[in-house]
């Protein structure tokens, strides 16, 4: 196996019997002054990549990898400008890529999912995908996974106290929002 690389070689293995496209996270040595990361696929083309954590000259990087079934490949991680990914945006209460635009309401619930291909909102107007708690759960034997119908028939309690929404990350490989809420004493 040839692991020669101009930067840090990262071996990626796909044990599955089907092709996969996935994000890979690896910790590598990068110069402390490096502001970005460039990751090269085996064909020499850059792939979407970003630095997600730093500790001096150690960096945790995230990059997009495409793998054939039951195979491995060596990716080359170097300091530099990241390969451009598909358009990813995270700002305020919105996440967006080339296919979907997701908007959160003030409670941090999903208020809208626009399918850009069809120009259609997948969430009914005035509704939202909400985080809620079903209480009390009357199951004594398997309360972690057994939810009785009587519990499901009750109105769930909303989780909408002290809501804070912030951008967790917005890079070439991944974008995300962080929603923090309080429920009871948690």
Task: Label each region the model flagged.
Residues 1-186:
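Catalytic and substrate-binding regions of extracellular carbohydrate-active enzymes
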């Amino acid at each position: 196996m040839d692991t020669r690389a101009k930067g840090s070689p990262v071996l990626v293995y796909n044990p599955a019997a089907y092709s996969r496209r996935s994000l890979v996270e690896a910790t590598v040595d990068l110069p402390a002054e490096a502001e970005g990361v460039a990751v090269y696929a085996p064909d020499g083309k850059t792939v979407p990549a970003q630095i997600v954590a730093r500790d001096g000259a150690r960096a945790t990087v995230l990059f997009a990898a495409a793998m054939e079934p039951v195979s491995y490949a060596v990716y080359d991680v170097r300091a530099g400008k990241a390969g451009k990914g598909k358009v990813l945006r995270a700002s305020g209460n919105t996440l967006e890529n080339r296919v979907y635009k997701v908007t959160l309401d003030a409670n941090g619930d999903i208020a809208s999912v626009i399918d850009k291909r069809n120009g259609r909102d997948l969430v009914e107007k005035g509704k939202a995908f909400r985080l809620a708690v079903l209480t009390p759960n009357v199951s004594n034997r398997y309360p972690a996974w057994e939810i009785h119908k009587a519990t499901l028939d009750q109105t769930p309690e909303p989780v909408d106290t002290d809501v804070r929404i912030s951008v967790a990350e917005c890079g070439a490989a991944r974008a995300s929002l962080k929603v923090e809420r309080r429920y009871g004493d948690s």
